Amino acid sequence: MLNLKIRSARIEDAAILAAAERTIAETPGLLVSRPSELILESFEEKIVELSKIGRYVVAQKDGKIVGHALLDPMRLAAISHVFRLTIMVHPGFQSQGVGEALMRNLMDWATRTPQVGKIELLVRATNERAMRLYTKLGFVVEGRFRKRLRLPDGEFVDDIAMAWFPDR
């Protein structure tokens, strides 16, 4: 993707990030959160928090935010080397290299950051495109959470647990 820039998220990005996630959440099964559960203050707090203890980045194309991703460390000492990855490619920008660029940025940061020993993520079993990308980038399947997400129509979707270990 041409003109793609990855940068650290800023507090003034929070409204755009929240709005994008609300739009994505309108499609059942894409996110765990429902649109009404995605509030601006939570995004602002997460941006501030991860600027100190993790990483929160946005992808911009021609100045417009088109995706975002974060690495959030686990809080308990015994698993503090494990960082949870969350990634969103905003509507209309899938299959254009945004997700891969965000992932590579986070993985590069993780490789340079000694505190990161493992990155974990969950992906819907129905999201084959994302699973192919994660596998291409070196993530491995660690397990399956059956019937983890209940859709509004009562159906269930499995989540696949994947992980990546930085080379040092």
Where do the protein language model's features map onto the residues?
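Acetyl-CoA-dependent GNAT
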Residues: I11, L30-G92, M103-R104, W109, ...
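Conserved GNAT acetyl-CoA-binding A-motif
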Residues: A110-L122
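Helix-loop element at the rim of GNAT/NAT acetyltransferase active sites that forms part
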Residues: A19-P35
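C-terminal "cap" of GNAT-fold acetyltransferases
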Residues: F83, G117, R124-E128, K147-R168
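A short beta-loop-alpha structural element at the N-terminal edge
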Residues: K5-A19
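Hydrophobic packing within well-folded, soluble alpha/beta domains
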Residues: L17, A59, V89, L102, ...
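Conserved active-site alpha-helix within GNAT-family acetyltransferase domains
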Residues: Q96, E100-A101, R112, A125-G143
